């Protein structure tokens, strides 16, 4: 598993544009064909649906939002719905 997390998005609430993120994940996967790629970097209940719509992301690395059980559970529910 490879976790991609842009340094500028850690704890900022900012995420890459969907096209940019899709292209970056594709690049990583082309170089590392046998690995899953998860995304981390300001994943929260407000943006997880947008991130989930990027179909080449294999999962999420939850940082600060995992410290709040309500937010963490909300992310999990939204990920699997």
Summary of predicted features, one role per range:
Residues 1-34, 38:
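Active-site rim beta-loop-alpha module in soluble metabolic enzymes
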Residues 28, 51, 72-75:
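Hydrophobic packing residues within well-ordered alpha-helices of enzyme cores
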Residues 76-80:
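Short, hydrophobic alpha-helical segments
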């Amino acid at each position: 598993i490879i976790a991609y997390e842009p340094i500028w998005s850690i704890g900022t609430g900012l995420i890459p544009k969907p096209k940019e993120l899709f292209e970056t994940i594709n690049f990583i996967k082309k170089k590392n064909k046998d690995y899953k790629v998860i995304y981390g970097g300001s994943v929260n209940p407000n943006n997880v649906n947008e991130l989930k719509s990027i179909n080449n992301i294999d999962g999420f690395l939850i940082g600060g939002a995992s410290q709040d059980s309500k937010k963490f559970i909300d992310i999990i529910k939204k990920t699997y719905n």
